[in-house]
UniProtKB/Swiss-Prot annotation:
Binding-site list for a divalent metal cation: E148, D181, H207, E247
Gene name as annotated: frlC
Name the record gives this protein: Fructoselysine 3-epimerase
Enzyme class per UniProt: isomerase
Domain of life, per lineage: Bacteria
Organism: Escherichia coli O157:H7
Length: 275
């Protein structure tokens, strides 16, 4: 089972610390968070991409994916006027360009909250328009685009496996995939494995965390309530061969290396001995 480190937790340290820690602690790859000060797409375009490529080479650490910040601060393709929507889409396109240049395996985005007063037909119409434009761009440059479902605490657009199916049906692009952050189904009493049943080969990536079942908080494995050992055995039995990013975000920023080590050790302890 291949593991990835998410760099978001290192955002108060130089990004080289994330590459160094991923390498020294034994992660198989790294998922780059696209926010300042580390890897904001416009900053990469202005020259910062050279550092990212150099660090990947120095530490021999594959960049499994690039995840620009699209949950509303300041970019949210699902909310705001046409100028805001256009700015968000342009940023995501630039992120795909940067992902391509850093040889990332995918660009991962989400459909953030569309606003409490927005009716469903407007939400889904806007999502379809956005994804259609982004997928056309992804197809032109040869980049896989992953749409991440969020928890209902974060969004009212794509939050479960059926929402993902709807989005994929609206925009049937060979470059559009999805994934599952296992916190999202767990807090909605949705079986995690239903994503495997429903999405098939459109399920491209996993974010592994623990959950309290009542919030979008991402815990280190073992700190929440999820039956992770049993879940991982089911995932292995399904033949999943992609990466699992252990997605520590902002809760552990005071000691990212220590918690990244602990998270990886606990994750590996969940796996059968032959994995």
């Amino acid at each position: 089972m291949k593991t990835g480190m998410f760099t978001c937790g290192h955002q108060r340290l130089p990004i080289e610390h994330a590459f160094r820690d991923a390498s020294e602690l034994g992660y198989d790859g790294i998922e780059i968070w696209g926010g300042r000060p580390h890897a904001f797409a416009p900053d990469l375009k202005a020259g910062g991409i050279k550092q990212i490529k150099a660090l990947a080479q120095t530490y021999q650490m594959p960049i499994i994916g690039y995840t620009p910040e699209t949950n509303g601060y300041p970019y949210n393709m699902m909310l705001g006027d046409e100028h805001m929507r256009r700015e968000s889409l342009d940023m995501i396109k630039l992120a795909m360009d940067m992902a391509k240049e850093m040889n990332a395996g995918y660009t991962l985005i989400s459909a953030a909250h569309a606003g409490y007063l927005t009716p469903p037909n407007v939400i889904w119409g806007r999502l379809a328009e956005n994804l259609s434009e982004l997928c056309e761009y992804a197809e032109n440059i040869g980049m896989d685009l992953i749409l991440e479902p969020l928890t209902p605490y974060e969004s009212n657009v794509v939050c479960n496996a059926n929402d993902v199916l709807h989005a994929l049906a609206l925009v049937p692009s060979p470059r559009l995939f999805s994934m599952v952050d296992i916190c999202a189904p767990y807090v909605q009493a949705e079986p995690v494995m239903s994503y495997f049943d429903k999405l098939g080969d459109k399920l491209r990536h996993l974010h592994i965390v623990d959950s309290d079942g009542a919030s979008d908080t991402h815990y280190i494995p073992g700190e929440g309530k999820m039956p992770l050992r049993e879940l991982m055995r089911d995932i292995i039995d399904r033949g999943y061969e992609g990466y699992c990013t252990v997605e520590l975000v902002t809760m552990y920023m005071n000691e990212p290396r220590l918690y990244a080590r602990q998270a990886l050790e606990r994750f590996r302890a969940l796996l059968p001995e032959d994995e």
